A protein has these predicted regions:
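A short mid-domain helix/strand-loop element embedded in enzyme catalytic domains
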Residues: 84-100, 118-142
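Short, intrinsically disordered, mixed-charge
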Residues: 56-63, 119-126, 167
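Short Lys/Arg-enriched alpha/beta "domain-start" segment
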Residues: 1-95
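Hydrophobic side chains in well-ordered alpha-helices
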Residues: 6, 53-54, 113, 117-120
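Glycine-rich beta->alpha junctions and the first turn(s) of the following alpha-helix
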Residues: 102-115
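Short, charged/polar micro-motifs that form catalytic or ligand-binding hotspots
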Residues: 44, 107, 148, 152
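Membrane-associated alpha-helical segments
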Residues: 125-126, 132-180
Length: 180
């Protein structure tokens, strides 16, 4: 996201708070949106129409959005049991406070971002698979030196992109600041 302009806009429009690399929107009690600097949005308690409006707004501030936009839908509910449980696509919480939801949002956002890395790697492998397969089958590569260099360059760029962004998967500062 274009994070600073997004925050400035949202701070004028609705209740928005910024904590390092996360914007938190709380339009109503028990309704949260967590917007991560790296382009992932986790919503809790939004109805379908409000979700669509927010996503449409966020796309205006997106930088190189994935095509198509990746969406995952999970259900959460309050549970009388202690702690947090995730089974299939159901998250059960004994506490649906903003802090608990934000901690889960960090995990879900990182999972979504990791899935996008996996998709990009899979596409690169599928696009270049013919090179080692042809080499193994025929002993030669049916590409010019220039074409082969381009393919190697694309693979290198993909690797560099992922390595440079892999720090997104570190333990979020939020969890160090709020260990409870």
């Amino acid at each position: 996201f274009q994070f600073d302009p997004l925050y400035e806009f949202l701070a004028r429009q609705q209740h928005a708070a910024r904590m390092r690399d996360v914007l938190t929107l709380t339009p109503d009690p028990g309704v949260f949106a967590f917007l991560f600097e790296y382009g992932v949005c986790v919503l809790c308690g939004y109805d379908y129409e409000a979700e669509r409006r927010l996503v449409d707004l966020l796309l205006r501030y997106a930088v190189q959005p994935l095509e198509p936009v990746v969406e995952e839908e999970l259900t959460y509910r309050r549970s009388l049991d202690d702690g947090v449980r995730i089974r299939h696509d159901l998250i059960e919480l004994d506490d649906a406070s903003e802090l608990v939801c934000q901690a889960l949002a960090h995990a879900l956002a990182q999972s979504t971002r990791l899935a996008s890395f996996e998709t990009a790697i899979e596409e690169t492998i599928n696009r270049t698979r013919f090179i080692p397969e042809t080499l193994a089958r025929t002993g030669a590569i049916a590409l010019s030196r220039r074409s082969l260099a381009r393919e190697r360059g694309r693979v290198y760029l993909e690797k560099a992109h992922i390595v440079l962004q892999f720090n997104l998967l570190d333990t979020p500062e939020f969890l160090w600041e709020y260990p409870e």
